Amino acid sequence: MNIQETVLNILEDITGTDEVVNNQDIQLFEEGLLDSLATVQLLVEIEGQLGIQVPVSDFDREVWGTPKQIIQQVEALQ
């Protein structure tokens, strides 16, 4: 499984909707699909499944706001 598939699977599990797969430009925070607790869960899952550590201090909702942006950020950190 590649980074994109893994991140989308993680997001689908955390948000409980496949909308994150079908619309990768959806604003996760504005739509109420992610909150601060879900964000921590997302970062833990990314580290656990991909071995990529994302410091919480580097997490900015403006840059990590959509599934597409999250995939780009994770790929940049690998």
From Swiss-Prot:
Species of origin: Enterococcus faecalis (strain ATCC 700802 / V583)
Protein name (record): D-alanyl carrier protein
Protein keywords: Cell wall biogenesis/degradation, Cytoplasm, Phosphopantetheine, Phosphoprotein
Pathway, per record: Cell wall biogenesis; lipoteichoic acid biosynthesis
Protein origin, superkingdom: Bacteria
An MF annotation (GO) of this entry: D-alanyl carrier activity
Domain Carrier residues, every copy: 1-78
Family: Belongs to the DltC family.
A GO CC annotation given for this chain: cytoplasm
Function: Carrier protein involved in the D-alanylation of lipoteichoic acid (LTA). The loading of thioester-linked D-alanine onto DltC is catalyzed by D-alanine--D-alanyl carrier protein ligase DltA. The DltC-carried D-alanyl group is further transferred to cell membrane phosphatidylglycerol (PG) by forming an ester bond, probably catalyzed by DltD. D-alanylation of LTA plays an important role in modulating the properties of the cell wall in Gram-positive bacteria, influencing the net charge of the cell wall.
Residues bearing the modification O-(pantetheine 4'-phosphoryl)serine: 36
Annotated localization: Cytoplasm
Biological process according to GO: cell wall organization; lipoteichoic acid biosynthetic process
Post-translational modification note: 4'-phosphopantetheine is transferred from CoA to a specific serine of apo-DCP.
